Amino acid sequence: MRVKHKKWAVPLMEAHPEMMTMDPASFKGRWQERFAKPQPLQVEVGMGKGQFIIGMAKAHPEINFIGLEIESTVAAIALKNALPEQLPNLTLVRGDGAGLDTYFEDGSIDRLYLNFSDPWPKTRHEKRRLTYKTFLANYQQVVKPGGGLEFKTDNQGLFEYSLTSLNNFGMIFDGVWLNLHESPENEGNVETEYEQRFASLGQPIYKLKAHFPVN
């Protein structure tokens, strides 16, 4: 998500270290210290303005959540949205999804979420897609054996590409939905900002769940 840079973004994030960190590598191996108590850990890569990760933290107090966003202004907007909620099981990160192995210990994450990622439609940009094989290898390193990944998008091309990429990587599919909002899987679904927008226009939302095999 790209928005115009706001001068207040970095100062706001610096003013709330209890909720936001811009130095995620310093917490490698000790993320649970940022929460009220140790619990299973789930991470959203590319949280945007935070609607999904905040909603998940509210709906699942038994799980600790981390929202990761590379764009400083967008991350700061997510912080503004999260602060009034005062959720003890949520922390936010200004960081790059390509650096998960520098932020998290091997096998420390229970589940990853990729929601409405940039499709990077040009072939020469394939390596930037969050479901490209090098990203999947990075995810496999930090996710627990047998741990899962959930992916939602409105982009049919990216979804089809991701199905192929995950399959070629050897991931095991737990579910594939070509119209999430018209399926039973939509019960309890926490929507993102983009998801609400595209669904209101009648655009089908695609979703997959998959996990890494246990060697």
Swiss-Prot record:
Keywords from the named record: Methyltransferase, S-adenosyl-L-methionine, Transferase, tRNA processing
Alphabetized Pfam families for the sequence: Methyltransf_4
Chain sites annotated for binding S-adenosyl-L-methionine: 44, 69, 96, 118
Region feature Interaction with RNA, mapped onto this chain: 124-129
Binding site for substrate: 122, 154, 192-195
EC number: 2.1.1.33
InterPro entries for the chain: SAM-dependent_MTases_sf, tRNA_(Gua-N-7)_MeTrfase_Trmb, tRNA_methyltr_TrmB_bact
Catalytic activity: guanosine(46) in tRNA + S-adenosyl-L-methionine = N(7)-methylguanosine(46) in tRNA + S-adenosyl-L-homocysteine
Coiled coil: none
Enzyme class: transferase
Active site (catalytic residues): 118
MF GO annotations: tRNA (guanine(46)-N7)-methyltransferase activity
Pathway noted in the entry: tRNA modification; N(7)-methylguanine-tRNA biosynthesis
GO cellular component: tRNA methyltransferase complex
Cited function: Catalyzes the formation of N(7)-methylguanine at position 46 (m7G46) in tRNA.
Family named by the database record: Belongs to the class I-like SAM-binding methyltransferase superfamily. TrmB family.
Matches recorded under HAMAP family: tRNA_methyltr_TrmB
NCBIfam families assigned: PRK00121.2-2, tRNA (guanosine(46)-N7)-methyltransferase TrmB
Protein name as catalogued: tRNA (guanine-N(7)-)-methyltransferase
Originating species: Limosilactobacillus fermentum (strain NBRC 3956 / LMG 18251) (Lactobacillus fermentum)
